[in-house]
Design a protein with these regions (language model features):
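Flexible loop/hinge segments at secondary-structure junctions
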Residues: 63-443
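Secretory targeting and sorting signals
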Residues: 1-27
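Secreted, propeptide-processed cysteine-rich mini-domains
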Residues: 29-41
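Extracellular/mature segments of secreted proteins
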Residues: 40-67
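Processing junctions and N-termini across compartments
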Residues: 22-24, 29, 45-46, 432
């Protein structure tokens, strides 16, 4: 006699396609369990032998609220299951370079929350060093650093094994050289050698003949204005050098650019700390500031100053009046910073950027900003708590895909190239909890 068939799934919500209807032989149904999961934010039901596999549940999940900005993303993460198994809080800290984007994606109405299950600590922007230290001592769930944590970069804490951590590009930006000479000094040009000489104390005045020559000579409008600073003995003619007093990945990118430019006496700041007078930099009229926000404020408040700051900070209302120097590209052309010129640098570098090959300096091409940088998010490769593991890597996957188009450009960053987003996902898929991958694909 033919085995009778038994309907085991309801037809409710069939019009919207929210529940999959399955028809199985009644004899087989006794050995299977009904399990559910969200796929593309819709319920999907399935039958499995004995128990629900990872990513499925006997409890029917509720569709998540729409992720703010997800439809605007340049990259897609729709094939990644963003469900988090339980409520979880994540501790975060690190690079001030990242602060604007971290802020908008972890707090407020635009934040990633996985349907309200994920909350983030406040982001104090303590600097890249604090991000690396916090992730290795266990006080953070996600650390952020402009410079990846590697022995080659001199940023690997003592006793730490690099292979125990996964590092992914979080955002793409560029550092700029800002200055404050008051009005009448727009479009100042500085060579890498001149910037190095300023920080080494060789050039101490804005009226220096080398700077005047770079800016059209003594007969040019800008050259005359610079020369007049010295002739009139104006206080702002004395260059006030500003540097990052705490561990800073922006400092690392800045010093690496100068090092790559071939300036004698310049080397990448291995610990990403630029020391003051008598230390790594020989300038004597020098002051330290806390972070990128402090650097922008310091330049804005100090006549005669020079400093280096992440590009997005000069776009913040209140900082927009900061003058930014033009720099030379690899072809010797004078370039102004923009999302386009920073993006061109990343495009020229291609997909070769990894934690062991992270610098983007003096790439070939037209309108290429001479030093751009990826900032990195760091998580342990093995995380004991399953919910923490899933929340950490799913947030980072969401941010490196959806978050790029929705938020990165608006905050003054260049959206990650698609190839870099794919690289980030591949790395995140190696993070596990109890040997099980935490970034699971929908099916």
């Amino acid at each position: 006699m033919k085995k009778s068939l038994r309907l085991i799934a309801a037809i409710s919500l069939a019009a919207t396609g929210l529940i999959t209807v399955a028809i199985l032989p009644s004899g087989a149904a006794a050995h299977k369990v009904t399990c559910y999961r969200l796929v593309a934010n819709k319920d999907k039901a399935g039958k499995f032998s004995g128990h629900c596999p990872k990513g499925w549940s006997k409890t029917k999940p509720k569709p998540k609220p729409p992720v703010v900005g997800s439809s605007q993303g340049t990259n897609s993460s729709s094939d990644i299951d963003l469900v988090v198994p339980s409520n979880v809080s994540l501790a975060i800290n690190g690079s001030s370079f990242d602060a604007p984007l971290v802020g908008v994606t972890t707090s407020g109405s635009s934040a990633y929350s996985a349907g309200g299950k994920v909350t983030f600590s406040a982001y104090p922007a303590g600097g890249s060093g604090s991000g690396r230290t916090g992730i290795t001592n266990g006080s953070l769930n996600i650390g952020f650093s402009d410079v990846p944590m590697t022995a080659g970069a001199g940023t690997l804490p003592s006793g730490v094994t690099e292979a125990n951590y996964v590092q992914v590009p979080y955002l793409l930006g560029g550092a700029v050289v800002g200055y404050n000479l008051g009005g009448g000094f727009d479009n100042l040009k500085l060579t890498a050698a001149e910037v190095a000489d300023i920080y080494n104390g060789t050039i101490t005045q804005w009226s220096d003949s080398q700077i005047v020559a770079t800016n059209g000579g003594a007969s040019s409008t800008l050259g005359k204005a610079l020369t007049a600073l010295g002739t009139a003995n104006q206080p702002k003619n004395t260059i006030k050098v500003l540097y990052r007093a705490a561990s800073s990945g922006t400092t690392e990118a800045f010093t690496y650019w100068l090092y790559q430019a071939g300036n004698s006496g310049i080397a990448p700041s291995g610990g990403s700390v630029m020391e003051g007078s008598g230390g790594a930099w020989k300038a004597t009229n020098i002051d330290g500031v806390a972070n990128n926000a402090g650097m922008a404020q310091g330049i804005d408040n100090t006549l005669g100053s020079i400093g280096y700051v992440e590009y997005s900070y000069i776009l913040i209302p209140g900082n927009a009046a900061i003058d930014v120097a033009q720099l030379q590209d690899k072809n010797g052309q004078w370039i102004s910073p923009s999302l386009t010129s920073i993006g061109n640098a990343a495009a020229a570098a291609g997909t070769s950027v990894t934690p062991d090959n992270f610098a983007i300096t003096d790439e070939a091409g037209n309108d290429v900003w001479p030093f751009a940088t990826y900032s990195w998010a760091i998580v342990p490769k093995s995380i004991s708590n399953e919910a923490t593991c899933e929340a950490s890597v799913k947030y980072l996957d969401w941010e490196t895909h959806y978050g790029q188009g929705a938020f990165a450009k608006a905050e003054g960053y260049v959206p990650l190239p698609l190839s870099i987003s794919a690289y980030a996902r591949a790395q995140l898929q190696t993070v596990t909890s109890s040997g099980v991958e935490c970034l699971t694909q929908s099916s």
